[in-house]
A protein has these predicted regions:
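Conserved adenine-nucleotide phosphate-binding loops and their immediately adjacent elements
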Residues: 4-60
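Loop-to-helix "switch" segment enriched in basic
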Residues: 258, 265-315, 351, 365, ...
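Alpha-helix C-caps/helix-loop-beta hinges
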Residues: 105, 353-354
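Alpha-helical sensor/transducer elements of the RecA-like P-loop NTPase core
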Residues: 51-53, 82-83, 121-131, 176-274, ...
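Post-nucleotide-binding-loop coupling segment downstream of the phosphate-binding loop, primarily
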Residues: 44-48, 56-63, 67-177
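A structural signal for repeat-array scaffolds
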Residues: 87, 91, 216, 336-337, ...
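Amphipathic alpha-helical scaffolds
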Residues: 74, 83-84, 173, 177-191, ...
């Protein structure tokens, strides 16, 4: 199954021991407990295009506003992990580590590309792992219950400025469950809420394709809680990916590709590979096929679509089949069985948060690639 660049392979780099330097960059959990902090793996920041505004916003929130909880949302392939890895590089690549913004920078994957979809560390495993790292392996006889472990972790987050990252949060959320946690993983909700509401020196960044339940309420209650919805690359930044791969295109050809794929970096890279492999690097030959969704692009969209509720799927179907913007009253008339305006409004908000629909003065629409994916369901 295709994994987006949010799950890219990590790059090994030397660990700085805490007794000699002030910043520790810790190995991602995959998802076993890390026994010590003497070596580490960090997500690799490869060639990076654009995202200047997003990086500036994140730096403002973290360094100036001292936000305690940040969620980065976006469709698969948008480069959420790459964005945060680039951000973290600014905190860890300084030659003068004593001046680093954080003493600890710790990244945890709640699911890795090599593991099954439903395999994720329990909140007890994650909390115990973090406490061992922050205590220099000195913490013993730790409590077993999540609320007690959270209280223990908060002591360290209050004493020391740490940057924590939880990646792939959607892997512990229910499919079609409106942001509800899978049974046995509800403790992550308590952890997120506590970090967002408590007073401390640290910051937790959550990376996910969809938000957990009640996050929007938490964001509205606390000024230290922020949400960044990652959209596609700007046209000029996406174009740089094609130019770096030696593909020549006219402005009209590039505009078609950008409109079809919404600036999704991973999908653009998949298209580049196909153009080289099947069409000798000629973009016009690829466009002449009139096919937007195929192979790994189909798999990527299918992963996202299959997580939706039945009503969310119905809304996407209605918009895709109509192929023109629709307002809420028009959507209400098309949905069978009928639903209330309140339920539809909540569904539209959920889809908008996940960047699966777009809205403007003309109404609600879906992107071209998602439209083709949906219509292909009726042809198969």
């Amino acid at each position: 199954m295709l994994e987006a660049d949010d799950y890219q392979s990590p790059l090994s780099v030397p660990l700085v021991k805490p007794e000699t330097h002030s910043t520790q960059f810790i190995q991602p959990l995959q998802p076993q407990i890390q026994p010590d902090g003497d070596y580490n793996l960090a997500p690799k920041v490869s060639v990076f295009y654009g995202r200047t505004a997003e990086l500036a916003t994140l730096n403002q929130w973290i360094q100036v506003n001292r936000c305690q909880l940040i969620m980065v949302l976006g469709m698969g392939g948008m480069g959420k992990t790459s964005l945060i890895a680039k951000l973290m590089a600014g905190f860890t690549n300084s030659t003068d580590l004593s001046s680093s913004e954080f003493k600890y920078v710790i990244w945890r994957f709640l699911r890795s590309a090599s593991l099954s979809l439903h395999h994720a560390p329990t909140v007890e495993e994650t909390l115990t792992d973090l406490i061992h790292i922050l205590s220099h392996q000195q913490a013993v006889d730790l409590p077993k219950f999540p609320d007690q472990l959270i209280s223990k972790l908060m002591q360290y987050l209050h004493q020391t400025r740490c940057l924590l990252v939880l990646d792939n949060l959607e892997s512990i959320l229910q499919w079609g469950g409106g942001g509800y946690y899978r049974p046995g993983f509800e403790g992550y909700g308590q952890l997120i809420r506590t970090i967002g509401e408590s007073t401390h020196k640290s910051c937790l960044i959550i990376i996910s394709r969809e938000p957990p339940i009640a996050f929007s309420v938490l964001e509205k209650k606390a000024n230290s809680v922020k949400l960044l919805i990652l959209k596609g690359l700007l046209p000029e930044d996406g174009l740089k990916i094609f130019q770096s791969e030696g593909i020549d295109e006219t402005q009209a050809e590039w505009q078609i590709l950008h409109n079809d794929y919404g600036g999704n970096p991973l999908i653009l890279k998949i298209v580049i590979t196909t153009i080289h492999f099947l069409f000798s690097g000629k973009i016009d030959l690829f466009l002449a096929q009139g096919i937007t969704v195929f192979g790994d692009i189909y798999d990527l969209l299918d992963q996202q679509f299959q997580r939706l509720s039945d009503l969310e799927k119905t809304v996407i179907y209605s918009l895709a089949i109509h192929r023109q913007p629709l307002f809420m009253p028009e959507l209400l008339n098309k949905i069978i069985p009928p639903v209330t305006s309140q339920k539809l409004l909540g569904t539209l908000e959920s889809l908008k948060l996940r960047s699966l629909i777009e809205c403007n003065s003309d109404g609600f629409t879906v992107q071209n690639d998602l439209t083709e994916y949906v219509t292909s369901q009726f042809e198969s």
